[in-house]
Amino acid sequence: MRPSGRKTDQMRKVSFERNFSKHAEGSCLVKFGDTHVLCTASLEDKTPPWLRNTGKGWVTAEYGMLPRATGERMKREAAAGKQGGRTQEIQRLIGRSLRAVVDLQALGERQITLDCDVIQADGGTRTASITGGWIALYDCLKWMESRNMIKVDRVLKDHVAAISCGVFASQAVIDLDYLEDSSAETDANFVMTGAGGIVEIQGTAEGTPFTEEEFTSLMGLAKNGIGELVALQKQAIAG
């Protein structure tokens, strides 16, 4: 039995609030249950040095947590003068995941930065950031299209979404909250496209190694869950 009472294949309630910020070209407040992340997409008319004069653009990401996003206040990383390893790992994952569905040549020599700021954390912040980040990216590209800068359907090749799965109390479960994640026997994150392509899989056994059969169960849960998330993304951008 899961602490939340959810079924093994039941995700938390997911919602997207588009255009949350009046300043950013694209923005979305994404909620996976009690995990809330503000994703903003900012356009800059420049590219990283290694892409200059190539005709290609770039999509990158930064990730952070508000000091009281968790049960106890955390010190701001800016106050410490450097980012932690976890932060760097997560923001690179977000950037890779979004670039997987972007035609950088069609974007042109421009950079879009996704800022994913966790307002409240209850497990799955990286997967929420990727899933909500896609919405913010889409709205940024629509903003560009309205100004005759690009065509969205040429730049954005597919949807991308992410979900966590794990083995909790000897059962394969989807979308772990913090209570489950902190005591899971196996923890994995899956990033996939709308067409079912695998972008990235991160899986770790916290104690006893997991079996191929358990991994197959997690993969099945993830495929179904990401299918649901992509359907919710489509519903959000149609509204």
From Swiss-Prot:
Its EC number is 2.7.7.56. InterPro entries: ExoRNase_PH_dom1, ExoRNase_PH_dom2, ExoRNase_PH_dom2_sf, PNPase/RNase_PH_dom_sf, Ribosomal_Su5_D2-typ_SF, RNase_PH, RNase_PH_bac-type, RNase_PH_CS. It comes from the Bacteria. Pfam families: RNase_PH, RNase_PH_C. One of its GO terms (biological process) is rRNA catabolic process. Keywords: Nucleotidyltransferase, RNA-binding, rRNA processing, Transferase, tRNA processing, tRNA-binding. PROSITE patterns: RIBONUCLEASE_PH. It catalyses: tRNA(n+1) + phosphate = tRNA(n) + a ribonucleoside 5'-diphosphate. Phosphorolytic 3'-5' exoribonuclease that plays an important role in tRNA 3'-end maturation. Removes nucleotide residues following the 3'-CCA terminus of tRNAs; can also add nucleotides to the ends of RNA molecules by using nucleoside diphosphates as substrates, but this may not be physiologically important. Probably plays a role in initiation of 16S rRNA degradation (leading to ribosome degradation) during starvation. Homohexameric ring arranged as a trimer of dimers. Belongs to the RNase PH family. This is Ribonuclease PH. It comes from Rhizobium etli (strain CIAT 652). The gene is rph.
